[in-house]
A protein has these predicted regions:
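Copper-binding active sites and cupredoxin-like electron-transfer domains
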Residues: 1-173
């Protein structure tokens, strides 16, 4: 496998440099030129299937001067899974290409797992605390109209870049 780091400029986002054969290891480095929040994912064909199996994540490139201090930070990454098993079936689930092509996921998850941000695992903050959310979407198919019930985002960095929208109720991720 290999990875496509959307924070890396150049062909394949580092895919050629990160290709690693079974039983081997690979290292590479890069200079991040642009601050922002970026997706990375497996770049080995079929890419969509590997993404749909959870081979993605977020990489944050902070500006040289750093980010303003906040009380809490959270990372949230959405993904969708398409399985041949029945909903809730335990164990390894085989990928269902037909469901993926129809964009009919069995699971839409945050941080790779059903219920990862609910109950005892929910994000907890106190009134008056400043919070920074890093929100991404690994896909491979669905988007999210992301919002927090009962609040408005002071600042939204559109698509993880440097354009800032203020006082946002819902943002597309």
């Amino acid at each position: 496998h290999n990875i496509d780091l959307h924070a890396v400029s150049g062909q394949g986002g580092g895919a050629a440099a990160t290709f690693t054969a079974p039983g081997h290891e690979t290292q590479f480095s890069f200079t991040a030129l642009n601050a922002g929040l970026y997706i990375y994912h497996c770049a080995t064909a079929p890419v969509g299937m590997h993404i749909a199996n959870g081979m993605y994540g977020l990489i944050l490139v902070e500006p040289k001067e750093g980010l303003p201090k906040v009380d809490k930070e959270f990372y949230v990454c959405q993904g969708d899974f398409y399985t041949k098993g029945t909903y809730g079936e335990a164990g390894l689930q085989q990928f269902d290409m037909d469901k993926a092509l129809k964009e009919q996921p069995d699971y839409v998850v945050f941080n790779g797992k059903v219920g990862s941000l609910t109950g005892d695992k929910s994000m907890k903050v106190k009134v008056g605390e400043t919070v920074r959310l890093f929100v991404g979407n690994g896909g491979p198919n669905l988007v999210s109209s992301f919002h927090v019930i009962g609040d408005i985002f002071d600042n939204v960095y559109v698509e993880g870049g440097s354009l800032v929208n203020h006082n946002v109720q819902t943002t597309l991720v």
